[in-house]
């Protein structure tokens, strides 16, 4: 599933081609996504795009009368096309722009979403979200406060959007490795120093992935059709049985609640 770096990479890639241009019309080939594509999107015509923003894993296209909320789901990606290339099986939505560009949404598993809202505030998919991990609000003090009485393992807690948004399976595994924290540790067992370090490395890992265009393991592509290159820098995720890049100990993989967890027994305590 695309996580924060992949969604932010998409935002940065499409923004220059959309902001200041006008949506001439939307071409919906298959509106049966996780939720049906909103009727308002079908009716778009001569509509300027004012901004392209992100909240958590949602892309937000600001229009004069409302917002398009896009979620990439498990396998979605957005590309900017310079010409109307023939659509393939999983190309479900096109926004045809006044500058000759086309924003094309591809989603093999159709778990993504294209929604419409007049106001962002209070929308059900955006309500109850925690802070952005790259914001000043997310820091060691905040993390320690939220972990202090939490009797659950730290890894699934990091992946809870009520704690912090956008840290999914890949980046939770990578951040815990960078901080030297075992993924099964109780959140309440983390010390002040460990919370400070973990907040710092989460920011560093996410920023590095954004620099590399995100992580492509299967379906994700950047807006120019290229893969994300952070996969080449993964320390533990997807490396079961391979030697730890730090100590040489084979990487361990376990599964909890259908989620794979990767870690080094020697480096993470």
From Swiss-Prot:
Pfam families: Fapy_DNA_glyco, H2TH, zf-FPG_IleRS. The active site is at 2 (schiff-base intermediate with dna), 3 (proton donor), 57 (proton donor), 259 (proton donor). InterPro entries: DNA_glyclase/AP_lyase_DNA-bd, DNA_glyclase_Znf_dom_DNA_BS, Formamido-pyr_DNA_Glyclase, FPG_cat, MutM-like_N-ter, Ribosomal_uS13-like_H2TH, Znf_DNA_glyclase/AP_lyase, Znf_FPG/IleRS. It comes from the Bacteria. DNA binds at residues 90, 109, 150. Its EC number is 3.2.2.23, 4.2.99.18. PANTHER family: FORMAMIDOPYRIMIDINE-DNA GLYCOSYLASE. Monomer. This is Formamidopyrimidine-DNA glycosylase.
